[in-house]
Amino acid sequence: TEESWKHCYDTFKGQGKIVMLNLLKYKPMADYTGMTVSNTQKDKTGKETYQYYLKQVEKIFENTKVGNILYYGESQDFLIGPQDEKWDAVILVEYASLDVFVDFVKSEAYQKVTGHRKASLEDSRLLPASNFNIQEVEK
């Protein structure tokens, strides 16, 4: 929502590097209904389509150096957390700053591929985080 973007911006503006934690729940099959996206992954699973999307994002990162995928892997049931909440995968993406992330999301290159993300996911969560300087944490 617009309110959550404003809160994120107010919280992380000027704090340097941020890491975005993504929790992903794939659709059984990709669904492009109502979307105009080139190179649709028709007859592909949500997981296959998300991985196609991720490869396109990696290409953007390689060309622009705006982000870095730190981790992408399958997830299982929570060890601590709601047992009825199920996620298929987790991805951690690092950006130099919140402004860099916002510029990336608004970029023409990203806008061309973001439909694949929407087509592939049943549900998702995006949680921004910034580093603590462990030396500055009170003991």
Whereabouts are the PLM-identified features?
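Short amphipathic alpha-helices in soluble, non-transmembrane regions
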Residues: D103-Y110
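Charge-dense polyanion-binding interfaces
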Residues: G115-K139
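Short S/T/G/P-rich N-terminal loop/turn motif that feeds into the first structured element of a domain
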Residues: T1-D88, A96, V100, S130-K139
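Conserved catalytic core of Hanks-type protein kinase domains
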Residues: E94-Y95, F104, S120
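Active-site-proximal segments of catalytic enzyme domains
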Residues: I91
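A short local loop/turn or secondary-structure capping micro-motif enriched for an aromatic residue
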Residues: F78-L79, Q111-V113
